[in-house]
């Protein structure tokens, strides 16, 4: 009986040590991604790309056009998939950088292959989400400073907001923006995870950064060719146009779909990373 209690204590102690190591590694990875020059460059680059491609549209806007209308137009601009590229910059290339600098083996030895993989995957997803969230809110802030109203009930032009009609054209308009921006950010995080996994196969930074846009386009085209329900198209999901009930339910379900997509590639990345380390 004494041996069993001691054995249980040892397992608990080991678990606590592993968790401390994991949190330390994750803290370091988040610092490398979110608190980095690449993160700032990605946010500012995405904002600049949005306004550079939308400047012609803005020149035709009237003072009474609101943020809902302008934001909706921005979602269909040329090169609108660039948000996937910029979101992948801080985190998706982590493995490429470690592999090229031969830092990966040292990192894996300090913790474990599993902790290394899971930590990189979480940091990649979080940084991609934050790039889109910060950039999109920066866009809205610039438009407000430009003089456009958040919402104009008297505007004759209204956008179809799907499940968000009730909160969009109301005093809770910023809650609408929070929901659709977070949905778009989760989409970016999911495809950044795909890019992170691909980086274990092709350790080329440029291929890694372009991969999310190509995957998004191919998946969307393939689902259309297979005549699958349109509400599951990435193009519909990422814009918050797929309806799964009310605004809250739609947000949770849509973000859950992208989160599940991201988890699949996080697991694949961890396994592929382990094999890459074992085989050199």
Feature names for model-found ranges:
Residues 3, 9-43:
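Aromatic- and glycine-rich beta-strand/loop motifs that create alpha-glucan
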Residues 42-49, 205-219, 234-237:
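Central hydrophobic cores of alpha-helical transmembrane segments
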